[in-house]
């Protein structure tokens, strides 16, 4: 109930009239089944005041960013922005914690004095012998994190956005960051036509944006246009996300994004033990990545 309440209050603060309209429709239906949870949503001094709070923040931030310009000079696809320099030490401390009676501060002092060889031994023992990607290390891996800035096509973003154990934020969908050209388009020699259509859509986006605003203009942007977003997740989630999203049946674009994340964890962060233990991250390339998955799905449908 509270989740719906919060969602409706945020929807009521949205700049798009369509979103606010659906908020009212949802409220009407939800009050038929959980009325007691939604008493405050449209009270002037409660829910409506809360929605105004969200709306005021959005408007103020929109004004502020205009002071700094709105064009980006970088087109880097994946950038590792932030990570723990001493991630492996933190993870070792957390790995030992539940097996001892010592305080965390005492364990920190112990780990700081260990040789690199001993640290590696403890980490490998904690990670264990992973026989498949579902064998993920324990909660000590949640002690450290990575933060990435990503520029990818909107379709890939929508797939990666589905992961919940992370902090993810994104910018407005636009035509300002270019677009991707699917490999199949190049293979059938349709690239010129593709680019022509995308450029025309880009011009239409600008026309709509100047007339109705950028929030409305987002509706016409195809999934192949790029969007910028940030993803921050802990090391344990990195095992799950990167190994799952680089599987052979994944889409080539989000596979590439996740492969680059893994490379940056290894080479930029220098977390060699952690990166190498993500042994089900697949850096291979495949033709018709999803064909086997589609064949398997077709077989299942045929059996019904």
Q: Locations of the language-model features?
A:
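A conserved ligand/cofactor-binding region detector
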Residues: 1-304
């Amino acid at each position: 109930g509270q989740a719906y309440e919060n969602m409706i209050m945020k929807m009521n603060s949205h700049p798009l009239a369509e979103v606010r309209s659906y908020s009212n429709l949802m409220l009407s239906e939800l009050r038929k089944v959980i009325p007691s949870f939604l008493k405050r949503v449209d009270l002037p001094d409660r829910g409506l005041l809360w929605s105004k709070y969200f709306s005021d923040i959005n408007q103020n931030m929109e004004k502020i960013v205009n002071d700094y310009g709105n064009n980006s000079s970088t087109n880097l696809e994946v950038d590792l922005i932030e990570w723990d320099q001493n991630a492996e030490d933190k993870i070792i401390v957390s790995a030992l914690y539940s097996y001892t009676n010592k305080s965390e501060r005492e364990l920190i002092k112990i780990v700081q004095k260990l040789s690199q060889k001993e640290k590696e031994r403890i980490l490998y023992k904690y990670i264990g012998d992973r026989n498949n990607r579902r064998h993920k290390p324990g909660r000590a891996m949640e002690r450290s994190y990575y933060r990435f800035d990503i520029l990818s096509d909107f379709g890939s973003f929508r797939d990666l956005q589905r992961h919940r154990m992370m902090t993810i934020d994104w910018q407005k969908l636009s035509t300002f960051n270019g677009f991707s050209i699917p490999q199949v388009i190049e293979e059938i020699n349709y690239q010129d036509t593709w680019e022509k259509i995308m450029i025309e859509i880009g011009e239409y986006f600008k026309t709509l944006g100047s007339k109705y605003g950028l929030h409305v203009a987002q509706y016409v942007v195809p999934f192949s246009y790029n969007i910028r977003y940030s993803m921050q997740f802990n090391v344990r989630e990195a095992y799950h996300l990167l190994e799952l999203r680089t599987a052979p049946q994944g889409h080539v674009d989000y596979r590439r994004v996740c492969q680059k994340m893994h490379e940056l964890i290894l080479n930029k962060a220098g977390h060699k033990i952690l990166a190498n233990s993500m042994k089900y991250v697949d850096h291979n390339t495949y033709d018709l990545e999803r064909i086997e998955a589609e064949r398997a799905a077709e077989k299942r449908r045929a059996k019904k």
